[in-house]
Amino acid sequence: MPTPITPAMITALMTGYRSDFQAGMSMAPSQYKKIAMTVPSTSKSNTYGWLGQFPQFREWIGSRVIEKMKAYGYAIVNKTFEGTVAINRDDFEDDNLGIYSPLFQEMGRAAAAQPDELVFAALRDGINAACYDGQNFFDTEHPVYPKVDGSGDAQMVSNMFVAKTGSVGAQADYSGPAWYLLDCSRAIKPLIYQDRRKAELVAQTKVDEGRAFTDNEFVFGASARRNVGYGFWQMAYMMQSPLTLDALWHGWSAMREFTADG
């Protein structure tokens, strides 16, 4: 005889699956925090007008020196991500629910792993995606102005290097995988992870509504609102070259010369 479905059983089911979901989230150790700063978001998007300004201290002599900084309009719009699964009502009635625990654990693991996937994909795609100055994050022509208000003739600065291969007269760009030098020693990191709403598990489990009524199944879904973007290009250098000590020194030396406006 099928087990009657009661509100108490639905509550117990959700408690168990939420526990599985949380357990799955702990299975995905994060790496993204090493290269991206986490910024909480409370709206549809965040605008990072302060990008381009490097905070620095000077000796306080007389009045404070207040300089009008160039304001940038770089914005990151939050995106909603989801994952949804369905459980057959017959399995619920037949008390055959333990088989779904690994599914909810994997859903939790996927939710926790996604920030890594987003951040490292943004790093890879930085050669084709714009940062705060309007240039691609990895670019050969980042404008650096002589004054902090963005006035004057800009000097073009590159934060990428593409090696040449082949013999003289028949050279071509290196086509192997790129690697990256990142300055992650500061509070501000090269990339931005924007967190609007953390991953949560919800369910549609009323027996006389939705898919339980039309398709004989209960629906469970996880969702989160988040997105990624780019911080200071000065903190990153892309090397399209073999990984050698000479190439490493080239990139490190170039990064030491980077400055902001002014």
Report each predicted region and the residues it spans:
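N-terminal alpha-helical "arm" segments
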Residues: 1-28
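Sequence/fold signature of self-assembling virion shell proteins
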Residues: 2-5, 141-262
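Conserved aromatic-histidine-acidic binding/catalytic patches
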Residues: 5, 9, 73, 91-99, ...
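Short alpha-helical segments and helix-capping/turn motifs at coil-helix boundaries
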Residues: 7, 20, 69-70, 205
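Alpha-helix initiation and N-capping motif
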Residues: 7, 18, 78, 245-248
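Assembly/oligomerization interface modules of large self-assembling protein complexes
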Residues: 23-79
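Long, contiguous amphipathic alpha-helices that act as assembly "spine/axial" helices in icosahedral shell
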Residues: 74-128, 216-224
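Short, conserved secondary-structure transition motifs
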Residues: 124-140
